[in-house]
Amino acid sequence: MSHGTDRIALPPADAEKTNLVCHFCIVGCGYHVYKWPANREGGRAPGDNALGVDFRRQVPPMQLTMTSAMTTRIRDRDGQDYRVMILPDDDCVVNDGLSSTRGGQLANVLYGDTPVASHRLRYPRLNTGDDWVDTTREHAADLYAAITQRVLDSEGPDGVMFNCSDHGGAGGGFEFTWGTGKLMFQAIGTKMARIHNRPAYNSECHASRDMGMYELNSAYEDAELADVIWSIGNNPYENQTNYFLAHWVPNLRGQTRSKKQERFADETVGRGRVIFVDPRRTPSVAVCDQIGDADNVLHLQINPGTDTALFNAIFTYVIDQGWHNESFIADHTSGFEEAREANRMSLEEASQITGVSVEAIRRAAEWSYKPKDSGHSPRTLHHYEKGIIWGNDNYRIQASLVDIVLATGNVGREGTGISRMGGHQEGYTRPPYPGPRPAPYIDQEIIKGNGQILTVWGCNAFQTTCNAEQYKEAIHRRAGIVQQAMAKARGGSVDSMADAVHEATQRDGGLFIAAVDLYPTAFARAGHLMLPAAHPGEIELTAMNGERRIRLSERFMDPPGEAEADSLIAARLANALRRRYQEAGNEEMAERFAGFDWESQEDAFNDGFRMAHEKEIDSQGGETGRLVTYQRLREAGNNGVQLPVQEYRDGELVGTPRLYSDHNFDTDDGRARFQPAPWNGFLSPVAKQKEKYPLWVNNGRTNHIWQSAYHDQHIDYRTGRFPMAPLEINPEDAEAYGIANGDVVELFNDYGSTMAMAYRTPEIKTGQLFMMFGYFNGMVGEVTTEAVDENVVPYYKGAWADIRRIGSMEEYQRSVSFRSRRYT
């Protein structure tokens, strides 16, 4: 492992150079990859190394971001050893040469001289009943097809279930979603699918879409141009680091004032303001407090689950003051009066519900919507994330916020918008989902014993679902039935094994589980078949970031063993099913599995993303996706193009910086729709726990750990910081329960219990806790309820529990830092 070394080999001037978009958060920072034979290295003179930097003298500050974590050694399938260096791209408009703690470790997650390499899946693996053994791609695909064929023939498509990602980045991309989606929805035809982070096949933004607006409608540049930025249920410094540092912070410091003056010559402009809506003082709030002051940083420290009341009061106050945009409402919207009446709430009532003072709510409204000295309305950019998405009735909260945006016309103009901040990157291209709305609640279907085969693709619901304890119990119990049947069928043919599995699922209530992943996750180990996937760099992959910017991550190394792209795994499974139906003489079913004759990721991209103008395809590229090719993206580099593409002109793809600048919204009549969203209290299961238990258990991400820690759990640098999921607790509460820093504690309620590592901090209110989400050692989902909104979007953040001290861990006390993470 190269991390922590005191010497870095420089790439020679002729090193291979390719483009790579960071695997991780939605910002999608651009990086350059340098690859060269391991027995060579570049010189210190600028002409002797590929970086063009003079290392013969001290490199000036901020000229280069380079650490030992950004370089490693790999070995390709030809047996040749290479060095790889991955550095941020100074010319990328997304990150402006910045690197986050996640992107800065990209070299550390390659298959090579790295801590993760020995943990990667290299070959398909089969559970023989009492052990896991390697097998071939062909054997694995044939067994999967044989079992799926039996379920389809006996139960129909709804017997085949999927837990499947729907995003871009390391876990997928447009090729991934098309390959898996074509298999699930077109070939198999199932509606029994759920998405990686929620228990049904739905959108996280149904309300925004129903009201006529796609949820990623602004440009990152808008954060530089806004008068006010709202950050609602979002922690951008930790979760969208370089969007925050490269685009928000300069505005808050007043460094974009001249840019605003050039764009908006007649308007009053100044340094930007930011308003946070969050129950805790996050590191993002702390950073902004240090950069700004009380005149441009406001934190509305809201009571949990009360966002709708806050937004309705602001909506009412703005209208009562006459700050709404009457011409925009009249010309481009419908339903205003209904929403105005339904959402009416006074500042005083909202203050009682939310715990935020009347003065603070009024100040937020004045900053954001009161006309400026020039008479112009403020340009206000509204960003939200999991505090709303996983909040108390997703649909209602989101609708109440979008109502404010529509009332004030803050969409489609520079410096405005209503966009989610996002977690991972995006990359959606699939056939239409064949199920209803609301979609089936797949977790509950599995708990009730439905479904016979479950494919877990690029996700791990054990660590990321709600009501996880009951869900995992059902998975283990039902998978165990199949495991026993497979043990008894050892030594037989593929068909005899498939017969045994089918009998166990149909007669005895078992569940056959196949997993496609980079690693043998806890969910995969609970199952019966594992298929090894590849990630960016090992394959070519396209995805788009939070401003709809699509780029091509280029291949620069071989995947390990028989790992391959997810799209090609989907094709392999589909082709195996087609062969079986052809052999059975069922040409009708065989034809459903046709059209998977892909040999590369580019073939899958061309079949899906580039064909939305001819086929019935739901694609973030839209009908103009046909203009996008791998070669054109390769030429566009790390700046890519913002979707939808307008045209290809003079050798360049021309994109769309922000949506709805023409005020033509995504509705039948082109008018945006107000949505009544009255405050309605808490979802029932959560309300019951709130009455019974004293502590609210909030949850979310931290800067150091990405998603379910699928890479990070294998890296000592990460697990040394957080050996167990940290639980922030106010010192007063900690004293009351006898809890010290580093103690192992147990949270418990009617839904289950989980363990965590105590982390005392005054930045969290008494009566509240904050636990890191999705970790492998301590899972907050085990104390969350099954509560969902009308579209089966879960209230992950709605958990109340009690706490007890388990004891002290000497190693935690010795090696883990409990200094404040607020950096100020």
What are these model-derived regions, one by one?
Residues 1-321, 357, 450, 457-459, ...:
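N-terminal export/assembly segments and adjacent metallocofactor-ligating motifs
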Residues 116-139, 146, 153-157, 171, ...:
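N-terminal leader/propeptide and maturation segments of large enzyme subunits in energy/redox metabolism
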Residues 176-280, 284, 308-312, 397-541, ...:
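Extended redox/cofactor-interaction regions of prokaryotic respiratory oxidoreductases
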Residues 288-295, 340-346, 376-384, 451, ...:
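Short acidic (Asp/Glu) and glycine-rich catalytic loops that position anionic groups and cofactors
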Residues 294-301, 532, 549-560, 714:
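Short beta-alpha connecting loops at secondary-structure transitions
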Residues 314, 332-439:
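Active-site phosphate/pyrophosphate-binding segments
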Residues 537-559, 574-576, 761:
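Glycine/threonine-rich phosphate-binding loop and adjacent beta-strand/alpha-helix elements that clamp
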Residues 568-624, 712-728, 732-824:
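Long, contiguous, secondary-structure-rich segments that constitute the structural scaffold
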